[in-house]
């Protein structure tokens, strides 16, 4: 019998079956056998059954989970790696005599296809359908069709370690066949697809993308193939319609698929929605021309992606993978080869190749990056996003480092390139997990990691605070996301961003960085309407030097509009309000892009008390409005007088202890470095465990690893310092000068007035402000240098509010300890569990990126 072959069409795309095609649907129950030793033959008895489309996981086949201690990612209740057999009989009708017969496996792993026990084809493409010409083998009559799928071999080893087509961090390395499984008498033919207005005349001018005759801005997200119910990508159009609907609700118009390519259904839904897609090769690592196995595999995958999907209007951009390093000439060779196949696309070597240190190279139409070229440590002039790990940028980047403002942007970094710059994996601010989410995992994956994190918190005596930790860290994360996104929007020469992420990433140490959970459901942090206030085609932007003022100042700010909508705004008004004050600005220009709308000068003398206000901007004709918090404090206060009314010290000396025991009030601001963590303003980046490991490997400072504060705004300590339960911009001077204390050795129910939320690895009870009754006196401990913080109006106001509290009747600590007890608390080491090592595929070693 003539051996059949994998069909490779020399066309740029394939669509649904033609109307005159005959089709036999092969979905349903198949015979099944695991082949752990590689000894099963296609004709052997197979006593088990399985439902296809599906995987061994969704059918609960393979090895039942034995160890439930995994915290790096979600767990598979049933898993299998190796060869597995799927077999069934097929009946070819007489009317198919003389017809071609093709088998389509829309998405699977390396496979072998047998008809009546004879091998008739094999394939190892994982990004596109596998199609086999079985004409010679499937004549009219009854035949036995057997398919061996191997998720343990057949692709280069680097793909298992890196690609989101395989990784256990998200999609899992499943075995099975998903999507369409069918026999047909013809192959899909390329059809014309209606072009959504968003894609018309898409091109590049200078550093901007254009479509429809005007500049557009790519407001994107990173996608890592997170489908927690199935453990594999959705293959139906409706699921992808829902996916893109959520993206649109949150103002996004772009998705980057990190080291993988989505299926046909995604492109169909994106074509309908007007969402720009950037698929990638299934790779993250070193491009080594000498590794011909890897190079040939990646070239074949790219060619297959172009043949299969390039006709889709939504497929506009392509990259060779994630954070590649190695041979730039080889990367360029790949790009030019794919460009010849699909010249209407735009190409880049890799998302964040060489972590951005190599800058732009010939052949790159655009640059997805976190920086443009190298920089000295502590120099942020090349950066194109606001947050970094401590391993990758001094002090974790610009947002954590600089005094809060709405003026800083990435214009300097973007000016180092001449192509459009897209901010790579923007934000990555952690939120403490929501353990109510555990109940939602009813499918192929289970969050034993979340159960372990919950148990750790309970062991630390803080289980009752889990929801508050989630809400407080999430609200602060939301504001940090807003800042990072607006830094992009107020950069005139930036072309877009790709968030990491709108959705939680449940792997790589468990990175709860999403505004939505892993199911794309809300976490209750904000509505989509509130989010679109700063993430939409048209966004009004407050450009100011600070958020905090005294009442002797005038709030001076510029107003800009990121106008990437479809029409000119000339003559339209931008209304503003601040408390009871309001006004309007008339837009003076008909330009698109980032435009100057006008200036605000708002006197603040009316505010005689410390006040938190909302400054709101809204562009005429838009539903959304953008809101920033503003704080106004009295310029004159009685801080110096109040300092004389309490004992202020950095050390609890014998004399101070005696005065405390005899009834005086003591404010202790210790310089202690033992039993403390550092002061981190933003929530920790991505995942503490992973970047702790990377920082230590590279002799970098380890991030303090915290997730913001938790407090009670109604506590009398805040009578003169308006606050929410969470960190906000007015906390910057106090937090940056802080070193929160580990209160693990206090009673389980003891709570500090201002608590700092720790990460899921350590679970320390961290105190920024806490109090005790000692003898006849009262002790307030502030783990921050308030004299340093008082250099700013908000820091001075916090100091004032602390002292007003201490000199009021409300200062009445309930927890009683002795001086000796307090000394033991401050000096007794806290017993902490060991944090496991977790490395990343990108090594972050400077010598690897030069």
Provide a role label for each language-model segment.
Residues 18-69, 146-156, 176-183, 802, ...:
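Accessory carbohydrate-binding/adhesion or oligomerization-edge regions at the termini
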Residues 19-21, 37, 190-247, 268, ...:
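N-terminal carbohydrate-binding accessory modules
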Residues 24, 32-38, 61, 76-77, ...:
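Accessory beta-strand-rich segments of carbohydrate-active enzymes
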Residues 244, 254-515:
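Substrate-binding/catalytic cleft of secreted carbohydrate-active enzymes
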Residues 644-689, 776-778, 782, 802:
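Short alpha-beta junction capping motif
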């Amino acid at each position: 019998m003539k051996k059949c072959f994998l069909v490779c069409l020399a066309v740029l795309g394939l669509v649904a079956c033609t109307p005159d095609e005959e089709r036999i649907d092969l979905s349903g129950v198949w015979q099944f056998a695991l082949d752990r030793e590689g000894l099963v033959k296609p004709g052997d008895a197979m006593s088990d059954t399985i439902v296809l489309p599906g995987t061994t996981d969704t059918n609960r086949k393979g090895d039942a989970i034995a160890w439930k201690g995994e915290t790096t990612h979600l767990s598979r209740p049933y898993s299998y790696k190796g060869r597995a057999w799927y077999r069934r009989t097929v009946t070819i009708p007489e009317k198919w005599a003389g017809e071609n017969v093709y088998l389509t496996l829309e998405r699977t792993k390396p496979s072998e296809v047998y008809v009546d026990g004879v091998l008739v084809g094999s394939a190892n493409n994982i990004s596109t359908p596998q199609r086999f010409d079985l004409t010679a083998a499937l004549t009219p009559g009854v035949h036995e069709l057997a398919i061996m799928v191997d998720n343990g071999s057949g692709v280069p080893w680097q793909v298992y370690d890196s690609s989101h087509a395989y990784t256990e961090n998200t999609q899992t390395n499943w075995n099975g066949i998903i999507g369409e499984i069918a026999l047909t008498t013809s192959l899909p033919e390329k059809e014309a697809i209606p072009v959504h207005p968003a894609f018309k005349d898409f091109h590049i001018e200078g550093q901007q993308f254009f479509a429809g005759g005007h500049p557009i801005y790519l407001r994107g997200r990173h996608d890592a193939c997170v489908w927690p119910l199935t453990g594999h990508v959705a293959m139906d159009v409706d699921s992808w319609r829902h996916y893109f609907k959520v993206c649109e609700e949150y103002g996004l118009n772009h998705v980057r698929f990190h080291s993988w390519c989505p299926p046909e259904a995604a492109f169909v839904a994106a074509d309908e929605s007007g969402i720009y897609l950037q698929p990638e090769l299934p790779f993250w690592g070193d491009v080594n021309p000498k590794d011909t196995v890897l190079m040939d595999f990646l070239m074949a995958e790219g060619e297959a992606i172009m043949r299969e999907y390039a006709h889709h209007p939504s497929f506009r951009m392509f990259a060779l993978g994630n954070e590649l390093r190695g041979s730039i000439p080889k990367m360029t060779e790949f790009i030019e080869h794919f460009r010849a196949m699909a010249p209407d696309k735009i190409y880049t070597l890799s998302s964040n190749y060489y972590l951005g240190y190599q800058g732009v190279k010939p052949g790159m139409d655009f640059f997805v990056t976190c920086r443009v070229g190298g920089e000295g440590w502590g120099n942020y002039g090349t950066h194109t996003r606001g947050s970094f790990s401590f391993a990758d940028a001094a002090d974790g980047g610009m947002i954590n480092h600089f005094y809060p403002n709405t003026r800083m942007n990435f214009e300097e970094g973007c000016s180092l390139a001449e192509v459009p710059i897209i901010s790579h994996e923007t934000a990555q601010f952690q939120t403490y997990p929501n353990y109510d989410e555990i109940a939602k995992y009813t499918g192929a994956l289970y969050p034993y990691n979340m159960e372990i994190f919950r148990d750790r918190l309970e062991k630390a005596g803080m289980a009752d605070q889990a929801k508050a930790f989630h809400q407080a860290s999430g609200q602060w994360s939301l504001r940090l996301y807003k800042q990072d996104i607006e830094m992009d929007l107020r950069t005139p020469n930036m072309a877009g961003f790709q968030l990491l992420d709108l959705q939680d990433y449940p792997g790589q140490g468990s990175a709860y960085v999403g505004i939505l959970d892993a199911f794309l459901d809300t976490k209750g942090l904000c509505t989509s309407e509130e989010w679109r206030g700063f993430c939409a085609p048209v966004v009004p932007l407050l450009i100011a030097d600070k958020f905090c003022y005294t009442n002797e100042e005038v709030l001076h700010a510029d107003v800009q509009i990121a106008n990437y909508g479809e029409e000119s705004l000339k003559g339209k008004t931008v209304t503003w309000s601040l408390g009871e004050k309001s006004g309007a600005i008339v837009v003076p220009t008909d330009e698109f892009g980032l435009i100057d709308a006008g200036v605000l000068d708002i006197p603040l003398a009316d505010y005689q008390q410390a006040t938190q206000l909302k400054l709101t901007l809204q562009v005429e004709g838009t539903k959304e409005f953008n809101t920033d918090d503003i704080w106004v404090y009295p310029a004159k206060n009685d801080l110096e007088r109040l300092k004389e009314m309490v004992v202020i010290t950095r050390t609890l000396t014998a004399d101070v202890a005696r005065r405390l025991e005899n009834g005086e009030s003591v404010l202790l601001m210790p310089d202690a470095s033992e039993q403390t963590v550092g002061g981190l303003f933003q929530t920790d980046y991505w995942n503490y465990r992973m970047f702790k490991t990377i920082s230590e490997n590279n002799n970098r400072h380890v991030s303090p690893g915290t997730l913001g504060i938790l407090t009670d705004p109604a506590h009398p300590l805040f009578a003169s310092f308006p606050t929410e339960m969470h960190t906000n911009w007015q906390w910057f001077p106090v937090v940056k000068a802080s070193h929160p204390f580990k209160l693990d050795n206090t009673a389980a129910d003891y709570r500090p007035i201002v608590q700092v939320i720790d990460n899921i690895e350590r679970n320390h009870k961290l105190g920024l402000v806490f109090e005790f009754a000692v003898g006849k006196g009262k002790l307030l401990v502030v783990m921050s240098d308030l004299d340093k913080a008082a250099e700013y109006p908000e820091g001075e106001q916090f100091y004032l509010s602390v002292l007003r509290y201490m000199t009021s009747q409300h200062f009445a600590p309930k927890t009683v300890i002795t001086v000796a007890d307090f000394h033991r608390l401050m000096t007794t080491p806290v017993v902490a569990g060991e944090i496991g090592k977790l490395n990343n595929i990108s090594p972050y070693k400077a010598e690897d990126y030069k």
